């Protein structure tokens, strides 16, 4: 059991030499030299830099990093993936997503305007998790300083450009589909009936 020492039971330091000895004892303990040895050892190791030269070098981020949002396109056709369901707007906890839709000529929803207020966004990732088409994802861009508090990202800024479409990669973070997804999908009944008709 630990016995606590009352302050007045301690040995009283009387002379200045005793104070100096107490100072040396408290300063030069073993922990100080252990810490100095760790710092010196890490400093003298080659190719063991813990810092990067920021403007020239960029940090490699995880696929799960939640940076500035991106609106992806379909790789085959280049059309927008967003179907205008509005789930991202409904689930947004900071109420920063705005979407305007209209019915197109084919009777499907078309997204007219899509904006995100990055000043209000808390980058929780709920919008990307709830998206049924994986149209909105978080990118790896973390350099988005702005002079205004309300900094909006609009559809034309978030959507993948046509000339960059060949470089667009499928989202590999949380909620993405596995690479062998085609092997895991079961055939629909219409495919089965077509196969039966072909065999007859």
Curated annotation (Swiss-Prot):
Q: Where does the record place the 4Fe-4S ferredoxin-type domain?
A: 73-102, 112-141
Obligatory cofactor(s):
[4Fe-4S] cluster
Per the record, the major location class is: membrane
Q: Which Pfam families match?
A: Fer4_7 (PF12838)
**EC class name:** translocase
Report the EC code(s) recorded for this entry. 7.1.1.-
Q: Which UniProt keywords apply?
A: 4Fe-4S, Cell inner membrane, Cell membrane, Iron, Iron-sulfur, Membrane, Metal-binding, NAD, Quinone, Repeat, Translocase, Ubiquinone
Assembly and interaction partners: NDH-1 is composed of 14 different subunits. Subunits NuoA, H, J, K, L, M, N constitute the membrane sector of the complex.
Which family is annotated?
Belongs to the complex I 23 kDa subunit family.
Function recorded in the entry: NDH-1 shuttles electrons from NADH, via FMN and iron-sulfur (Fe-S) centers, to quinones in the respiratory chain. The immediate electron acceptor for the enzyme in this species is believed to be ubiquinone. Couples the redox reaction to proton translocation (for every two electrons transferred, four hydrogen ions are translocated across the cytoplasmic membrane), and thus conserves the redox energy in a proton gradient.
Query: What is the protein's name according to its record?
Result: NADH-quinone oxidoreductase subunit I
Tell me the classification of the organism that encodes this protein. Answer: Bacteria, Pseudomonadati, Campylobacterota, Epsilonproteobacteria, Campylobacterales
């Amino acid at each position: 059991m630990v016995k606590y020492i009352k302050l007045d039971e301690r040995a009283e330091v009387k002379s200045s030499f005793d104070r100096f000895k107490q100072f040396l004892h408290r300063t030069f303990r073993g922990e100080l030299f252990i810490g100095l040895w760790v710092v010196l050892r890490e400093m003298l190791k080659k190719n063991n830099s813990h810092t990067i030269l920021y403007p020239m070098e960029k940090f490699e981020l995880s696929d799960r990093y939640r940076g500035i949002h991106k609106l992806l396109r379909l790789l085959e056709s280049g059309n927008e993936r967003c179907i205008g369901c509005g789930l991202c707007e409904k689930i947004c906890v900071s109420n920063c997503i705005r979407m305007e839709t209209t019915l197109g000529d084919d009777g499907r929803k078309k997204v007219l305007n899509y904006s995100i207020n990055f000043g209000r966004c808390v980058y929780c990732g709920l919008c990307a998790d709830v998206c049924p088409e994986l149209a909105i994802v978080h990118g790896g861009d973390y350099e988005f300083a702005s002079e205004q508090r309300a900094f909006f990202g609009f559809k034309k800024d978030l959507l993948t450009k046509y000339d960059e479409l060949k470089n667009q990669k499928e989202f590999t973070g949380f909620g993405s589909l596995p690479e062998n997804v085609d092997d895991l999908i079961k055939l629909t009944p219409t495919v089965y009936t077509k196969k039966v008709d072909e065999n007859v």
